Amino acid sequence: DGYYNGYYSDDYADVYINGQYPMKMAEILTQRVETHRDSKGHTHTTTTTIFSGIFAKINMKKSINCQIRIKEDGVFYNGNINMDSTQFEKYFDVDCSDKVITMQLLTHDVMDMLINFRKILGAPFDILIVNNVMYIRLHVGKVFESVINKYLAVDVGTVKRYYNIIDFLDTISKELIKNIENTEI
């Protein structure tokens, strides 16, 4: 989404989807740090956050031989493909290099799933599939920190949020992988 010169990573995990598709994920923070001098010679630093959240990469066995990008609505100026769901179009834009494969993979079930997770997470996310690699970015900020509050009790809201993030990554990756495996490419 833009140039960055500050990169930080935390909470790295290396897991398998369905026991066979490797997923690497971590909490990522990318920032653009710019230093400049004003007319009086004072140095000022401006830090702009480019991305803060979870980034996941999943290697799949089958290639779609194209690229599909799903982003927040308005990013692609309505994308280059119109989907069959007006509700989906309210939340997302889709840009792709093969409209037929994109329509086969983004079924009504997948679109409904993406809409529901967008509402549950309360944060935007992006999905990029390039050939046999799927990338997922969740713009959720800093996560997976201690869930004990000042009263030494488990913060149920935070635990639920963390569960929803993991559930999204697991559910959507499994569904898209299933559709890819079942699609004639």
Residue ranges and their predicted role:
Residues 1-185:
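Charged, low-complexity intrinsically disordered regions
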